């Protein structure tokens, strides 16, 4: 039977999403969703949304939402592009900055969508193994540059470990690589604020850094599919003007995104509760003999004791 697929599409395996239990009894943890509901401001904005607005196309570049996000991060609107969740942000970065036949580098293990996006682009995924303690190897940038990576991705905090790479190391990587560094901060809202981590200076000081954020985890809006990229205007403008889909963010998502950002008190209270429960769970697992990686996310990577039967 003949196929009309491009050869690289025919060869590749697609992305496998997490299992979606339907019995209504399973406690769903496999996609790291926020256990708390969205802000009441989001519910109110949805209730007040006039369906007559759906007759016309939404504001093409979601400027009001871009302004809110820029203010939140201490940046300008020209340094922000809104995307259809973090996954579209990744796709746009690959489409814009990785040539067919080029290389997309990341750490291993990492988000399983990365190699899929590379293969769709007919590019080569290139993996650099993390150290045994989940840290990024000192020669990571050297290896990525030797592979001629046009786009290099670091998940921070990392999934599946929860380990946080300090901004100082990310500055060094940005300086040493030859292409674009994309920092995937899908879980950054759960970082302990006392650590003082921020990627704003990375965006301000390097013209080759993109930072990915999403509303899915921290703002409990995984079902809405809303995210964004931060970066130097020279990186953001081609995405907005050339590779982004037309009207990629619908009117409802723009309105609800603004509502979520307006209620920082609620958002930060849920993040604090997640951190409290994370610490409590790690302590309880430790008392049972489990080993947990220090996490700055909303999940824990835990290893059972050798005698797991006894621990149970």
What are these model-predicted stretches?
Residues 1-56, 148:
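N-terminal "arm"/small-domain region of PLP-dependent enzymes with the aminotransferase-like
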Residues 63-103, 121:
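Phosphate-binding glycine-rich loop
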Residues 96-154:
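PLP-dependent aminotransferase-like
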Residues 102, 123, 177-180, 184-185, ...:
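A short helix->loop->beta-strand "cap" motif at the edges of active sites that frequently abuts
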Residues 132-191:
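Active-site phosphate-binding strand-loop segment of PLP-dependent enzymes
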Residues 208-286, 290-293:
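PLP-dependent aminotransferase class I/II
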Residues 279, 286-291, 299-312:
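Conserved C-terminal alpha-helix-loop-beta "cap" of PLP-dependent enzymes
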